[in-house]
């Protein structure tokens, strides 16, 4: 018996069944496909309680039966290996089937463990992505709220019946003293119709200011007033237009759209064309920008829209006027001053 145990130890390898301290074989059924012939014989000696000299062990060695061939053995093969002993063959076949089923269960368990690991990794990745998307959404929402808050807080408010320029998100209206109204956008637009006071917002309209060369007395009454810019029809112009040709004081005039790159000369010509003024007389007119209580003549090569935006950002509430050149000298004479600022002080 000791010689048999010694033979078992010598024929074992890394994938073979192990022996405990009592000499009992510890089966590694999941590795039986890697067993050698000696490993198979060792397993048969342990499970069937046979000697190494048993015909089964001899037939296994003669036929070179290794571990991966065991599941292929049928009952008849087992009976031939057992030298016609049916009882031993049945027992041998049952042990082979149990070992095969054990390996399949082990594979299923390993597959399930792998699937669980993959699902956990997928869950972790998905959770991280969702958290990242949530953070991005929160930042985007805060940015949008800040923009809306800034936009709403920077909008001018009309209080106590005082008419102010109310820019919309698309058009910035630039009033004109001769009834010309310019708006800061990319293209020239058509007529904007006035809306009723019941509307919450309406296009800003400008009314004609009389030429200063018509009457000195008229200037004395209104020299400290600027053209009224009304956001609805309930606020008419504060300047009378008696004896002034053109539209009536309460008539909404046309509005122009201009881009940032348009020069003063181009805007001036388009304004005159839009309001049916003679094109050949365009040098008799000038564009004047008013901000605070100051007025300044715009040179032909300047960019009125850019200047308008810069002054607006400084909170000076600018407005651009279309005037005749002769009006400025008359204003200086009536004021009795050497101030050559076009249009004088508002």
Curated annotation (Swiss-Prot):
Single GO cellular component term: cytoplasm
Keyword Phosphoprotein on entry: yes
InterPro entries given in the database record: RA_dom (IPR000159), SAM/pointed_sf (IPR013761), SAM_Ste50 (IPR015316), Ubiquitin-like_domsf (IPR029071)
Transmembrane domains' residue ranges: none
Gene Ontology terms for molecular function: protein kinase regulator activity; SAM domain binding
Residues in Ras-associating domain copies: 233-327
Polar residues biased stretches: 151-187, 227-245
The keyword Repeat appears for this protein: no
SUPFAM superfamilies: SAM/Pointed domain, Ubiquitin-like
Annotated SAM domain residues: 24-108
Chain positions found as Phosphothreonine: 244
One annotated GO biological process: pheromone-dependent signal transduction involved in conjugation with cellular fusion
Keywords, sorted A to Z: Cell cycle, Growth arrest, Pheromone response, Phosphoprotein
Modified residues (Phosphoserine): 202, 248
Region span, Disordered: 151-250
Note: Present with 1670 molecules/cell in log phase SD medium.
Subunit record text: Interacts with STE11 through the respective SAM domains.
Role of this protein: Involved in growth arrest during conjugation. May interact with the G protein alpha subunit.
Name of this protein: Protein STE50
Organism: Saccharomyces cerevisiae (strain ATCC 204508 / S288c) (Baker's yeast)
Gene name, Swiss-Prot/TrEMBL: STE50
């Amino acid at each position: 018996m000791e010689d048999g145990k010694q033979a078992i130890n010598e024929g074992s390898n890394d994938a073979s069944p192990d022996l405990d301290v009592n000499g009992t074989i510890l089966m590694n059924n999941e590795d039986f496909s890697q067993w050698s012939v000696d490993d198979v014989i060792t397993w048969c000696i342990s499970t069937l309680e046979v000697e190494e000299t048993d015909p089964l062990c001899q037939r296994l060695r003669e036929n070179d039966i290794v571990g991966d061939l065991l599941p292929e053995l049928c009952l008849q093969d087992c009976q031939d290996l057992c030298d016609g002993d049916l009882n031993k063959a049945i027992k041998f076949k049952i042990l082979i089937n149990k070992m095969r089923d054990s390996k399949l269960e082990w594979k299923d368990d390993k597959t399930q463990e792998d699937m669980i690991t993959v699902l956990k990794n997928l869950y972790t990745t998905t959770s991280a992505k969702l958290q990242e998307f949530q953070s991005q959404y929160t930042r985007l929402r805060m940015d949008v709220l800040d923009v809306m808050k800034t936009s709403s807080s920077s909008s001018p408010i009309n209080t106590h019946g005082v008419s102010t320029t109310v820019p919309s998100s698309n058009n910035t209206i630039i009033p004109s003293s001769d009834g010309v109204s310019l708006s800061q956008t990319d293209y020239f637009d058509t007529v904007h119709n006035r809306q009723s006071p019941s509307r919450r917002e309406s296009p800003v309209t400008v009314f004609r200011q009389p030429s200063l060369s018509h009457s000195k007395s008229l200037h004395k009454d209104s020299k400290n007033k600027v053209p009224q810019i009304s956001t609805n029809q309930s606020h008419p112009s504060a300047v009378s237009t008696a004896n002034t040709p053109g539209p009536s004081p309460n008539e909404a005039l046309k509005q122009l759209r201009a881009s940032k790159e348009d020069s003063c000369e181009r805007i001036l010509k388009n304004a005159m064309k839009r309001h049916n003024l003679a094109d050949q007389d365009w040098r008799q007119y000038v564009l004047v920008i008013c901000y605070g209580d100051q007025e300044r003549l715009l040179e032909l090569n300047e960019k009125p829209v850019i200047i308008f935006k810069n002054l607006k950002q400084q909170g000076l509430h600018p407005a651009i006027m279309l005037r005749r050149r002769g009006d400025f000298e008359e204003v200086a004479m009536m004021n009795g001053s050497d101030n050559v600022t076009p249009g004088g002080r508002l």
